[in-house]
Amino acid sequence: VLSSQDKANVKAVWEHVKGHEEVYGAEALHRAFVCDPQTQTYFAGKDLKENSAYLHGHGKKVMSALTNAVAHIDDIEGSMSKLSDKHAHELMVDPGNFDILAHHILTTMAMFMPQCLTSANHRSVDKFLSTVKHVLTSKYR
């Protein structure tokens, strides 16, 4: 459960993410695809090279969805309901991949904005990403 301090920390960190969703998202996805190649399973036939338009476009979608979740941090479940349905019923993504991607998102944030990712902010963002993962997997059965 995100405390009021966690929510404030996440919002503060996300002010530095806004406007960089494409770059951060592409970096996080690229790291996931290289370090954890099993994550490529859902992207057959897609150009997953580091500078590909597809990777940048999908990275922007991922991080923009998280930006939206931050904007609705008091109702993450409601704001991500359609995305949860899509991942559970249409895409059938292995829920373990959300853990992998969350790790690479945190790594990317630490790389691009180390001054923002203090230990307290790191903890809060990690809790936020865990909340998002829980919401995204809540409709799996």
Curated annotation (Swiss-Prot):
GO molecular function: haptoglobin binding; heme binding; iron ion binding; organic acid binding; oxygen binding; oxygen carrier activity; peroxidase activity
Protein keywords: Heme, Iron, Metal-binding, Oxygen transport, Transport
GO terms for cellular component: blood microparticle; haptoglobin-hemoglobin complex; hemoglobin complex
Keyword Heme in record: yes
Coiled-coil residue windows: none
Superkingdom of the source species: Eukaryota
BP term (GO), one: hydrogen peroxide catabolic process
Metal-binding recorded as keyword: yes
Chain residues that bind heme b: H87
SUPFAM superfamilies listed in its UniProt record: Globin-like (SSF46458)
Annotated function: Involved in oxygen transport from the lung to the various peripheral tissues.
Family statement drawn from the similarity comment of this UniProt entry: Belongs to the globin family.
Record text on subunit structure and interactions: Minor hemoglobin is a heterotetramer of two alpha-2 chains and two beta-2 chains.
Protein name stated in the entry: Hemoglobin subunit alpha-2
Species of the source: Triturus cristatus
